Regions:
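The feature marks short-to-medium sequence segments in extracytoplasmic or secretory-pathway proteins
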Residues: 41-89
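Short, surface-exposed ligand- or partner-binding patches at beta-edge/loop junctions that are enriched
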Residues: 91-130
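A short beta-turn/strand-edge loop motif at beta-sheet boundaries
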Residues: 37-41, 116
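Low-complexity, acidic Ser/Thr/Pro/Gly-rich terminal tails and inter-domain linkers that flank the onset
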Residues: 1-24, 29
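Short, solvent-exposed mixed-charge patches
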Residues: 132-134
Length: 134
């Protein structure tokens, strides 16, 4: 019997855009869905970009619940973008007490990704049982 639970990813999309302060951006967004049968918190994701041969070109960790508008992506530097996306508690959606079967949005941003990027992978790199769970 497979162990129940986990975090699944849904509605994952990618797009390229240009920021005046940070250059070209690869923006990956979607929903992290709590499949555990208890509330969770501090959902942390790892995004990896790969070339056509599967060689890793870069990786970034962010926390769910942090989203940037197109205006922010355009205005912020790469360091400011990363700082915004690494807020543990989530700035736009609370990354705490995420009920079973509920979801929380996420965003991963690679600044100036290599031209050889062919695919991306999203992995769960951390999650905690919510203090609010019984």
């Amino acid at each position: 019997v497979a162990a129940p639970g986990g975090i699944n990813f849904a509605e994952v999309k990618e797009r390229f855009t240009k920021g005046t302060a940070s250059g070209e951006l690869l923006v990956i967004s979607g929903l992290a869905v709590n499949e555990f049968d208890y509330p969770v918190a501090r959902v942390r994701l790892r995004g990896k970009i790969l070339d056509g041969a599967g060689k890793m070109l870069g990786e970034i960790e962010t926390y769910a619940g942090n989203l940037l508008t197109d205006e922010e992506l355009n205005r912020l530097t790469d360091k400011e973008i990363l700082a915004e996306l690494q807020r543990q508690e989530g700035s736009d959606m609370p990354n705490v007490n995420i009920r079973s079967r509920a979801s929380i949005p996420f965003m991963i941003v690679f600044t100036n990704p290599p031209k050889e990027v062919d695919e991306f992978i999203i992995e769960l790199s951390g999650v905690e049982r919510s203090a609010a769970s019984n």
